């Protein structure tokens, strides 16, 4: 099986970036900086969702499937790793494995955020950005199939693909996962991440991000079934593989116990 990397990111408003752009004093508390930026955004758009470049990445979680029977779910980096380190490690993973990336709205959110944040830090991601003119042995192949072009296959944005690239047809991962019999979100969602981060609950955010990565992977497996990439037996085998993997983690990682219990 080709290496599959289903991923998800969690973000919070970039407090330092907001301070810089609006020349806010260092004495202003972080929560007030965020409130200021949200008010500005509401005045501009009617909503408080920050522009992509003002999202600080606090977690990147992956569900990776490779080789004959290998699967791993985890969050990149250690708890005390900064944003720059985590982003660099994500692109190093791509550099090492050249996986099939799978996301839900990754083209609309996750990857653009990663682009802007890696630009801020000056992170090298040559393999990821290869569009046929790189120095890798197979770079020529990337002219026709790369991570960047919307209709290429190295990155499969499932939401975009299933919506036939029509934004009005986009639907939430949580809805589709639950309709397909998968757990979906359990307790936390993106709107609660800033409050959790501000309260020091980074571990909870990382756990939530991991469940979103697995939900994304499960949706990809279902897509492989309906698109004919898997027959029914192959699909059931892959579903059983990831379910058994998660079940084996439940003693040490309670979020997987909750996830498996919620799985119909």
Predicted regions and their residues:
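Exposed alpha-helical structural elements
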Residues: 17, 32-35, 89, 172, ...
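Metal-dependent phosphoesterase core characteristic of DEDDh/y 3'-5' exonuclease domains
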Residues: 2, 55-58, 62-80, 98-207, ...
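Short C-terminal domain-edge/linker segments immediately following a structured domain
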Residues: 34-42, 90-93, 132-137, 238-240, ...
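Generic alpha-helical secondary structure signal
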Residues: 26, 40, 94, 120, ...
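Conserved non-catalytic scaffold segment of RNase H-like nuclease domains
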Residues: 1-116
